[in-house]
């Protein structure tokens, strides 16, 4: 999977810009604040329905503009040896949005997100390891969403049951009114948890060698999973029943996969809380690379890899290891930096360079 064309209108500093990246390594340079991150941000919005720097209405739309527009054309695998071209467009005002995919209107942002797969590493990615459980649950669900066609329906089934149960709890509904939603929550939640656990076990097999290759000093050895209730002791149905009175008092559901979490284990460290910010970033990057490799194995093609501000996030040795691993894979990689990162100094003809300045994006040569 690789982007052939990215068109951006009225996004941050850009009034209108066209980007035609190579299918291999791409480097976007520019001063801080020039807008190079916004190129990756536009791609991320199309693939996730949100920016990695906040909501669309919080400064993403260019000052004076009413909305932003993003258009992406990409090539993806269509069979054993064939490719097809796909196109998607999104217009977003911060309050309302319209989207098109392959010439057809889409009713849900999920349709766009399911079509285009982008793995993003950016300065805030360390929260995947050092933050709360929500980004880690999203991480698992993204991987499942893109490799298991029926996962989204399962996730929505659980989310709907959870919303209905919580609404009844807040209303102080009688216990018997919870029975139907408890059954739905337990049935979908058990299946959701099994899928997550299977995915995490598969991911662990890829993560350990990835972490060893790019950051051997971490000693990352395994992943642990907390399903969101005492699954080894009781079923989710029983856990919901046992917690029912407490949930009625508190007004929310305290047991289930919406409270699940996972964590990395390290040979030489007591746990993720002992990690420095730099170590948390490296661990997060290893997890993202492992997820991308799993996607490639399951789908037969790599997702698009977007690495923002790589030079300031990793030292030259870790940069070199990461780039070497990505360059050895048939992945399209988009990297931003203020200048040529040392890890890319030997990339040669596989690297296409661009410069961002004054709201413009132009191809450059190594001598520029």
UniProtKB/Swiss-Prot annotation:
> Could you tell me the keywords of this UniProt record?
ATP-binding, Cytoplasm, DNA damage, DNA repair, DNA replication, DNA-binding, Nucleotide-binding, SOS response
List the InterPro entries: DNA-binding_RecF (IPR001238), DNA-binding_RecF_CS (IPR018078), P-loop_NTPase (IPR027417), RecF/RecN/SMC_N (IPR003395), RecF_2 (IPR042174)
The processes (GO biological process) annotated in the record are: DNA replication; DNA synthesis involved in DNA repair; double-strand break repair; SOS response
| Primary location class | cytoplasm
Q: What is one GO cellular-component annotation here?
A: cytoplasm
Pfam family, any one:
SMC_N
Name any one GO molecular function. Answer: ATP binding
Which positions in this protein are listed as binding ATP?
Answer: 30-37
Source domain of life is Bacteria
Q: Where in the cell is it found?
A: Cytoplasm
Q: State the family named in the UniProt similarity comment for this chain.
A: Belongs to the RecF family.
What does the protein in this record do?
The RecF protein is involved in DNA metabolism; it is required for DNA replication and normal SOS inducibility. RecF binds preferentially to single-stranded, linear DNA. It also seems to bind ATP.
NCBIfam families xref list: recf
PANTHER family registered for this protein in UniProt: DNA REPLICATION AND REPAIR PROTEIN RECF (PTHR32182:SF0)
How is this protein named in the record? DNA replication and repair protein RecF
Q: Quick one: which gene encodes this?
A: recF
